[in-house]
């Protein structure tokens, strides 16, 4: 049998694609006031938003246990797959990659783990490319290489109303968080070398979103691209972002997706967050 592809729940694949590709998804966990819930299965973004607005609620996230990956990998191997490529969110943002690597070590060279260096559809585009390659019957190394190549072809940009939630979760330093809150500055962030850093600062939310469009177009280069627009409880803003980027890119835009971020990333970016992932096609 061909190669199986595994990813994690932070890929946030659009609903129209989730049933089209053969992917196994291992969920991360969200913890609200001490109660654990699996992302996408037991807890949804709206519950996280409600807890974050409550202020007194304690919200955190945790990686899957290595045993969750071991079980998923073994199930696929028992089903007859020759090998597995497991593609995950940045190792600098989560212990998920580490947990997957620990599980893979128990199974020899039949499992290859890829650090996408990003999250959301930045991860999703890499996982989809791997699944497409696996579907053609390519070998284990070819599928791994395709995942890594497409992960290198994405730019992940996003706007948050406040850096406070990222600071609380340890995903951004206190100094950068202070910069983002000074004088009511609205921060635009991006993922660089697997870490979240402030890319730009503007005075209003409107200017931040306009800048996000400019940066997405800049990141697209000169060739054909796909984009994914993410949001947390901001569908109208996401639609406006998608329309603005689409208009600027014209015929170079191949596919455009709009999808709400899941509970794990929602716990760190907070209500109102919006993002654009640019995938530069080979």
Give the predicted meaning of each segment.
Residues 4, 10-20, 24, 28-31, ...:
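Mixed-charge interfacial surface used for oligomerization/domain docking
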Residues 20-47, 62-69:
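N-terminal short beta-loop-beta anion/metal-coordinating cradle
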Residues 51-77:
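Glycine-rich oxoanion-binding loops at beta->alpha junctions
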Residues 60, 86, 113, 228-229:
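Short catalytic-loop micro-motif centered on adjacent basic/acidic residues
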Residues 63-64, 115-117:
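Short beta->alpha junction loops
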Residues 68-100, 104:
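N-terminal glycine-rich phosphate/adenylate-binding segment common to multiple enzyme folds
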């Amino acid at each position: 049998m061909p190669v199986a592809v595994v990813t994690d729940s932070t890929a946030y694949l659009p609903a129209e694609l989730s049933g089209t590709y053969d992917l196994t998804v291992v969920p991360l966990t969200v913890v609200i006031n001490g109660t654990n819930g699996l992302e996408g299965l037991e807890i949804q973004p709206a519950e996280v938003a409600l807890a974050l607005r409550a202020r007194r609620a304690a919200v955190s996230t945790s990686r899957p246990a290595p045993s969750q990956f071991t079980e998923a990998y073994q199930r696929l191997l028992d089903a007859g797959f020759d090998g597995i490529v497991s593609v995950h969110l940045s190792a600098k943002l989560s212990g998920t990659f580490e947990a997957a690597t620990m599980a893979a070590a128990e199974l020899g060279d039949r499992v290859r783990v890829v650090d996408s260096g990003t999250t959301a559809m930045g991860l999703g585009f890499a996982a989809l490319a791997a699944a497409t390659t696996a579907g053609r019957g390519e070998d284990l190394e070819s599928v791994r290489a395709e995942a890594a190549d497409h992960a290198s072809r994405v730019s992940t940009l996003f706007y948050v109303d406040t850096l406070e939630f990222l600071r609380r979760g340890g995903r951004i330093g206190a100094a950068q968080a202070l910069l983002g809150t000074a004088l009511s500055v609205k921060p635009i962030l991006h993922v660089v070398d697997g870490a979240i850093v402030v890319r730009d600062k503007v005075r209003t939310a409107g200017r931040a979103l306009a800048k996000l469009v400019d940066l997405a177009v800049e990141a697209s280069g000169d060739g054909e691209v796909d984009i994914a627009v993410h949001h947390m409880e901001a569908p109208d803003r996401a639609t406006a972002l998608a329309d603005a980027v689409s208009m600027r890119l014209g015929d170079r835009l191949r596919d455009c997706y709009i999808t709400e971020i899941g509970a794990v990333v929602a716990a760190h970016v907070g209500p109102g967050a919006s993002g654009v992932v640019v995938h530069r096609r080979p």
